[in-house]
């Protein structure tokens, strides 16, 4: 009688309905609660398992297409571990960085492996007033310093009033190649003339496209079309004082530029190593790095990066293999 009253009180069974119906409904409710609990537990376990098998990578814009290719190809060999690119202030398991910026990431990572090099060239908008002013100049390192940086210490022989009309655009983002370009000429990134552009270095291309007097600089992967392998149609390289064979290569395809810069390093061109910073306590990360060094670097040219020389490349492979061995 109590069970029937309780059922009626809870609204499980109505007046006049069989008490057995009440019992059946109670059993069904209890079973449903168990099923819901089991599903929640399963989903919670599955989510935790998925999170444990996800690793994250940060990469500057110029290297992002290459990293995306690594992730795509690595997934074919190791489907149990997923690597994802993250942006902004989000923490990551790995970070692709220019060697010149290594100090900025040492607080979060304790190891660095080099995977290639990036080259930075001065550019302006095609057929712009800046391109006209710089036409035929063939600037050496000294004249490039005068064009891009503040300072009154330059010799009279390199002073050029035409330079004073030109507006320099440089990146202010922490991952910008501005510091690499500046350090190549013995300068600091705080000493650029002109205007600073926040955000991705790709915005530098947009800035000079809008300003007829604008000049800037960027990585090869940002100034060449990775599909056609030619300089982007809206851009023009600033003429540099280079040896004839180097200058001829700069008039060719991206692959010609990469090849010549792997064999010679003109003072007028900023070339910096690109590396991956990481912690050494994750076997999945170390195995991914081993794959990158053995298989991923073959995509360097495709995505606008120079290859390391053989000695440096072998040293990186030895480094990651020793870390894998040490963990066994």
Task: State where each predicted segment sits.
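Bacterial Sec-dependent N-terminal signal peptides
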Residues: 3, 20-55
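Residues that line or immediately flank small-molecule/substrate-binding pockets and catalytic motifs
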Residues: 39, 99, 220
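Residue-identity detector for glycine
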Residues: 6, 11-16, 46-48
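Short, Φ-rich (hydrophobic/aromatic) sequence segments
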Residues: 16, 23, 288-289
